[in-house]
UniProtKB/Swiss-Prot annotation:
PANTHER family: PHOSPHOPANTETHEINE ADENYLYLTRANSFERASE. Its cofactor is Mg(2+). Keywords: ATP-binding, Coenzyme A biosynthesis, Cytoplasm, Magnesium, Nucleotide-binding, Nucleotidyltransferase, Transferase. It comes from Treponema pallidum (strain Nichols). SUPFAM superfamilies: Nucleotidylyl transferase. Its EC number is 2.7.7.3. Substrate binds at residues 8, 40, 72, 86. This is Phosphopantetheine adenylyltransferase. It is found in: Cytoplasm. The record marks 16 as: Transition state stabilizer. GO terms for biological process: coenzyme A biosynthetic process. The keyword Metal-binding does not apply. It is an enzyme of class 2 (transferase).
Length: 159
């Protein structure tokens, strides 16, 4: 069975990677969609985010990374995926993700959403927090893979 894990990944964190790997243990294929949310301003370009996800996930069997600029339900229909995987860190996340699951279900009644609870060590980890720490020159290596930390350092050194 194919599952989709979509996010902006700006930047990808160890929490994101953990969710992808856990989803892969449950599903034959996990399609990671690096999405564009028109309501967000990004630090990293779409190409950088896709490239970073591909680098940190490597050539793991059954894990595929693609950029996506449309509705997730459209991609699901295109590839025959019936499951969306969403990570939740806390009750606030759950409420937001539950609302999103309702929208997905309204658009495609056959699409299920599976919620994976974040591991406790990732429960407070947010990409926005990583960006803020990096913007002040802080060490983000405990939150993101080395390649991501290097790119963030470059971005904020140039700014």
């Amino acid at each position: 069975m194919k599952a989709i894990f979509a996010g902006s990944f700006d930047p990808p964190t160890f929490g994101h990677l953990d969710l992808v790997l856990r989803a892969r243990s449950l599903f034959a294929e996990v399609h990671v969609l690096v999405a564009v949310n028109v309501q967000k301003r990004y630090l990293l370009s779409e190409c950088e985010r896709v490239d970073l996800m591909r680098q940190v996930l490597g050539d793991r069997p059954g894990v595929y990374v693609f950029p996506w600029r449309s509705l997730v339900v459209t991609y699901a229909r295109d590839v025959g995926a019936r499951v969306l995987v969403r990570g939740v860190r806390n009750a606030t996340d759950f409420c937001q993700e539950f609302d999103l699951a309702w929208v997905h279900r309204a658009l495609d009644a056959g699409l299920e959403t599976v919620f994976l609870a974040a591991k406790p060590c990732y429960a407070a980890l947010r990409s926005s927090m990583v960006r803020e720490v990096a913007s002040f020159g802080g060490d983000v290596s405990t939150f993101v893979p080395r390649v991501v930390a290097r790119l963030l350092q470059e971005k904020f050194t140039q700014a």
